[in-house]
Amino acid sequence: MKLAICSGYFNPMHIGHLDYLQSAKDLAEKLFVIVNNDYQVSIKGSTPFMSEVDRVRIISTLECVDKVVLSKDLDDTVLKTLKSILIQHQACGRNSFIFCNGGDRGSENTAEEYFCDNNNYY
């Protein structure tokens, strides 16, 4: 089974996010979404529009999303959460995985892309 993982603040959720998540689901059988936590919103410098609880609840109602995970990271990445999901995914004998970034990311590599590149994930 191929797993796609997306992450985002979704603060607030908008149509671009929906397109991003639906496109990611088209690439895999399952879609997991990591929602950045309230602490990460504060260190990003964003104004909290919705709480992490509300953002998780909204994302979990989307038909294209199979599982929502609240980020446990305390920096501006989702590396700890991503690694945790991958360990569980591989423990079930699955190793096909895609990490998807939204269109608002620049051409520079994110920490997550660097991790995936160095571990032969796509």
Model-identified regions with their sequence ranges:
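Nucleotidyltransferase catalytic core that binds NTPs
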Residues: 1-122
